Amino acid sequence: IRDRFNDDSPEARKITRRWRIGEAADLVGVSSQAIRDAEKAGRLPHPDMETRGRVEQRVGYTIEQINHMRDVFGTRLRRAEDAFPPVIGVAAHKGGVYKTSVSVHLAQDLALKGLRVLLVEGNDPQGTASMYHGWVPDLHIHAEDTLLPFYLGEKDDASYAIKPTCWPGLDIIPSCLALHRIETELMGKFDEGKLPADPHLML
């Protein structure tokens, strides 16, 4: 199975959408003419073009190019150096109410706006958000790739679990079925006095 699906990674499956100049201008927060003027002045690279019939046309801009425009025009949203990154939680005491869908779309929208985003799937063993971003649970993702080692005190921080996605600016901490073990293993570690905090504070 792995031989068959080994190339089924976020990078291998990446399809780069392009935005027309008007759409790019809206995302950047400037006018279309400002983009054209910056390209003519050399502040921005010459746009990618293609020939259709006898007419040469812009093919549109990738999100990486749009983020570069934001940097050039100074419109990219930035967090103050001494500010703590905002944390947004999506939760409900019921299954099937679109928690994952809301989380994924919110993360992608924030990344589209030029922000750096870390989507933490956390304790969900289904791994749906991981799969949405090209990481197939229990094929690409195993217990050691999730938060489980961090929860069990085997890692000092969770940075080892961060993986890139096909969305520029959006990374993910994935999950897989192994997280079914988390509650029983946490309680076992707690009984042994090997947890840095109470289990309910770590979930």
Where are these regions (language model features)?
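P-loop NTP-binding core
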Residues: 1-23, 27, 37-203
